[in-house]
Amino acid sequence: MEHRTHRRRGAVHTAEYQYLLERLREARRQAGLTQVQVAKALGRRQSFVTKCELGERRLDPVDLQRFARLYHKPISFFLPGTRKR
């Protein structure tokens, strides 16, 4: 896979990480949840969810697992080359 980077508000993300962010937003929409609902379920602020989805806050593996569990998606859903619905 070609290694490209994207800039968003001072952050630099690889194409792979940008893909993860897109899938994170998609999974939330598929689950029919708002950012406020997700934040409440995770015990976080809505700004946490927004920053994660925009790439302003780097996701760690534990956070990704929590999102995946809430959205009823396998971790592979969020990773390039493993597209599953």
What are these language model-derived features?
Residues M1-T14, S76-R85:
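Short, charged recognition helix plus adjacent turn
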Residues Q18, R29-Q30, R58:
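Short amphipathic helical patch at the helix-1/turn junction of helix-turn-helix
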Residues E22-A41:
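Short basic helix-loop element that most often maps to the first helix and adjoining turn
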Residues L24, Q35, Q46, P61-L64:
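Helix-turn-helix DNA-binding elements, focusing on the entry/boundary residues of the two helices
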Residues A31, L42, C52, L70-Y71:
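Core residues of bacterial helix-turn-helix
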Residues L42-L59:
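Recognition helix of helix-turn-helix/homeodomain-like DNA-binding domains
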Residues G43, V62-F77:
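DNA major-groove recognition helix of helix-turn-helix/homeodomain DNA-binding modules
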